[in-house]
């Protein structure tokens, strides 16, 4: 085997130093390479091409191996695939990939999966002829007639253009906007709230604009550079929220989605090192709350009015030093919880009333990843979650809360072949020098002789 030296390679390209000065938290910071973020700058493109050419030159001797690795990876991917449909507001939504095509196609069917297919976005057609294209997603209007969507043609995941599409004609309507980070529809189907990024790519300004208006109206500006601000709608379709958040502190404002011209009201005033998130139920608010004394979080239930009085707060799930609250989803009759316990996710189902039995979803392996997955319907009596482990591909399940039945909806297919039953997963605990128990996950093929002579990766 030949040992390569630096002299065997061509001289690598060197980026030009062009200092940019930024002031944050009272201190100046110099970034010599901030200019490389500007993908419209011909010098940036020239430099990227030089980097790519250098990489091609250095790795030229590995071309055959690269192809072998690529073919193996592709052999484990199902190129022509379709997501399991998700029902929302009378439509079944799904997406699919096709062999030889780079992007997804997003579709829906009205009422049933036997109804005619409506293609919402053919991203392959949208990206055709463009050197780079990223589709960031879409949001359907309450009347199901329009979609606001986000994309860019620069390859940057930080900056997106927003447009609005009429789903009947397939044409773009209304206004478009650059630098949008989030958006939410009001219930009048013509008013959009959206957030814009600033020159540091921080989402900080919230605007309101109707489809026929020439310009948006600034309704909130986050002036604290430690915070970013985003807008969202509630699952109940009742509210529009503005969330301001830093790494340790958050604050929310809201209005009725039926009254888009109202002034936003602060839910709870900003307090340093207090984070909270509001999850509306049609009869109350659920609030995930975290402060220095409750680092793992707790959940309160609060009335729709009068919650400003802390005496009106009722503990729904108390703080537990051994269990961290990682996610919440609200249904009409149940609260779904994602919890972190002993380093693993637990999914629990708790009645909205707080009374009655709390159910915990059982999983087959001792080590795994699981998460709530696509539950848009507020009135649903079942919910979906995804599961994967060291010996099991990602699988989508549906759990019926009333019947307590679990149904497998879709398992990731491995075209090259794979049988989870051929492997065993174990979880062991190692004792660190300070006495702390450290979990270890082990996967091995069935029939392994545990004689201490097996190599480990």
Across the structure, where does each feature detected by a protein language model lie?
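N-terminal pre-domain segments of enzymes
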Residues: 1-59, 63, 67-81
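Non-catalytic accessory segments flanking enzyme active sites
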Residues: 46-139, 228-280, 288, 314-315, ...
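Beta-propeller blade signature
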Residues: 107-110, 163-168, 206-212, 253-258, ...
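A conserved hydrophobic secondary-structure block that centers on an alpha-helix together
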Residues: 118-184, 188-189, 332, 337
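Blade-edge beta-strand/turn elements of extracellular beta-propeller
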Residues: 166-178, 212-223, 258-268, 307-318, ...
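Solenoidal tandem-repeat scaffolds enriched in leucines and small polar residues
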Residues: 187-256
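Generic long, charged, amphipathic alpha-helical segments
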Residues: 301, 308-330
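Hydrophobic beta-strand anchors of alpha/beta hydrolase catalytic cores
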Residues: 455-457
